[in-house]
Amino acid sequence: MIRCVGVVLVVLAALASGPVSAADDPGMTQDERQKLLAYLDRSQQELEGLLDGVTEKQWQWKAAPDRWSIGEVARHLLISEGYLFDQAMLAMKNPADPEWQTKTGTKTALLERALPDRTRRVQAPEPLNPLGDASMTRAQVLASFRQQRARTRQFAETTQLPLRAHLTKGLFPFFDPLNAYQFVLYIPLHMIRHNQQIAEVKATAGYPAR
């Protein structure tokens, strides 16, 4: 009899607490995963299309001394992809934050709104600055990028980790803190932003015909 009462109490406690909703689950939802994969594919297709056929002269050309060349933008994207993925992994090493929903619940929409918007310009942090290294060719940058992106996409497609519960800070205090999912999402949104920059370079007066 005592055992039966104990079982009933356990069941009642479970019913009182209720099932874990999708909003409470720190893992990626199916919609979040599909959105991330779509952004990753879109950003890669855009970049490869923009770089297709770019000559060495076009790769190195600058509209002004203080403006980035296409090559510099592409190297910045390569550096940033590695950094942002590493930040996601760094976040996963931190203890799960019980207040992750409060601290990061609105940040995904903020990233989607702010990052592709080129009307607000920001200076790249020093660790992500591509200046001073013009040795990588277009082919080398693309090969390295494809390797990194394959890793990022495989992770996005297969991980079951509770990404949203693990937080850390990055190089832009405006967004801090972000959770691990948001750092991975940052990768393609940041690329979409700079794909626009590459298109702007190609549309600038004086851009070499070949």
Residue ranges and their predicted role:
Residues 17-26, 71-75:
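An N-terminal domain-start capping segment
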Residues 31-79:
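N-terminal secretory signal peptides
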